[in-house]
Amino acid sequence: MTKKEFIKQYKPFALETERKTGISHLFTLAQAALESGWGERTFGNMLFGIKARPETPADKKQLLRTTEVLNAPNLGYKFPQVLSIYELPNGKYKYEVKDWFRKYETQEECFTDHAQFFFINKRYAKALLVKSDPYKFAEEVAKAGYATAPDYASSLKKIIKMIESYE
């Protein structure tokens, strides 16, 4: 799928999310693009990399490979399966693991759940104050710990800019 095809396919869901919640469709599209590799990794209709919770029913979760960057080498107990751990030059540790992620019946359900995720989790309260500005929202979502990648906000902002150029 090309980037233009990705935008065409998922923009209606992102616009509907923006209409319902006020969260910028540019942010939503950018995060879906980043987390799914522009639609290359959409297992279980999941585009946003939202982790399953312990109480998530078995039919609503899936065990997938992922990368996490953490501060210590002894945090493997946090994951169902650890594949490898490498120390990075900055003193942090890159974990290749399998972890539980949410799974959806439809992609539309995924977009709806993604927006609700920000409203349900109090750590995103500050981000929601700037939800209509995709760049500020990206900064605040990253600060709140959505992902462990150290350059998460800058990656999102580059993709937002790219999507804007296609609109």
Name every feature range the model reports, one short phrase each.
Residues 1-167:
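Catalytic cores of secreted/periplasmic lytic hydrolases that degrade extracellular macromolecules
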